Swiss-Prot record:
Name of the protein in question: Alpha-L-arabinofuranosidase axhA-2
Glycosites: N83
Record field: pH dependence: Optimum pH is 5.4.
SUPFAM superfamilies for this protein: Arabinanase/levansucrase/invertase
Signal peptide residue numbers: 1-22
Pfam families associated with the record: Glyco_hydro_62
Family: Belongs to the glycosyl hydrolase 62 family.
Annotated GO biological process: arabinose metabolic process; L-arabinose metabolic process; pectin catabolic process; xylan catabolic process
Any one GO CC term of the record: extracellular region
Temperature and activity: Optimum temperature is 47 degrees Celsius.
Amino acid sequence: MRNLSTWPTFAALLWSAPRVLAQCGLPSTYSWTSTGPLAEPKDGWASLKDFTAVPYNGQYLVYATYHDTGTSWGSMNFGLFSNWSDMATASQNAMTQSTVAPTLFYFEPKDVWILAYQWGPTAFSYLTSSDPTDANGWSSPQPLFSGSISDSDTGVIDQTVIGDSTTMYLFFAGDNGRIYRASMPIDQFPGDFGTESEIILSDERNNLFEAVQVYTVSGQSKDTYLMIVEAIGAQGRYFRSFTADSLGGSWTPQAATESAPFAGKANSGATWTDDISHGDLVRSTPDQTMSIDPCNLQLLYQGRDPSLNPGYDLLPYRPGLLTLK
């Protein structure tokens, strides 16, 4: 790969247009079209899930969790591909380190790639790299968060990390109807968010379950942030959305019901899956701002054939892509 010391300049050229030209706001209601399954797990694997994706040199770079056909979870990336239709033939590369439910981004202030995850040495951990395409080129684990939460069967789960000009924020769930937040000054990142967090959203367990993601909405007249959270509904998994004008502020429900969700069976257009589950909005930049272009909203998600129910670990999740109508 080329020298990443040139990355900030390259990124500024490559992604300046979407930031400047985005003149769309977030819709008040969402309606999508969906692909079918974009890829099948390679031999020996039963599922592909928990997707995190960034634009990289004009292509897509995706990391994910897999489960084998036995009893083990693992982590992987896909080889680079230019179009989502090419995901089916991209290489599937197992990692020697386990980075379940990953979050991938480029931390521009320190010129380093970050892969954050759960089930590591601490509650949340992270790895660093200068070449994110190499599934096994990452550093040893470092602590990202060392705290715990109460009233949760799983403990902390499904982190995401995002920054503004001064502060880095950690958001996470607990499969318990709550969303949590921690923060640190941006000049101290990458590092440990510590042990303390605050509850920023609270509801019934199924309404705020897991898979929280937070994004900067590009091209707006004022700072706008979008949060999506996976919920459990009568018709399957779906995403609710919330908005805020600061990452450290309060969050307002936007498309937050199963009948009118951010994305779910009611509006996905998908015919192969009832679940619209853990994934990532397609970002316009790879950096810590987690920026999305509201003129071109797409959601990379995990779906599955609802007629197949072999038990949670072996549920046959596959990647799919929603595109806003």
